[in-house]
Amino acid sequence: MYFAYGSNMNLDQMAMRCPGAVLGQIVCLPDWQYFINGNGYAGIEKKEGSKVLGCLWTLKEKHWRALDHYEGVAGGYYERVEMEVGLLGQNTFAKVWVYLSCNYQYGIPQPRYQIAVVEGARQVQLPVDYLPILESWVNGCPD
């Protein structure tokens, strides 16, 4: 299972990158926060008391190869690591794979990138009270 918290929540993007991938449940990663990295793409970092919401995808091996390519794993932009997330509204946890940014500098999103993230969050029906966190990054780091 893959935990998407950025633009890979966007159904149109995932249909293009990973045709046949199956959308799963909404999940929460406690004590982490969302940010836009210095390259202009989504990242997450540890922060006690915060949370990152996203969705799960069931992927086949060909999908993993495609995502590793798109996420720039070979170039050192992201690394794929295993983490534990909580299923939203349940006291159940699952081990999943997630891409972590190797760039922890805050930055300005690439053109239309954060809009695609927010659209994806709406498409997968993240809770509406989480959307302002994503929307706050549309023009760069919120103060």
Task: Report residues per predicted region.
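Glycine-aromatic micro-motifs
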Residues: 1-143
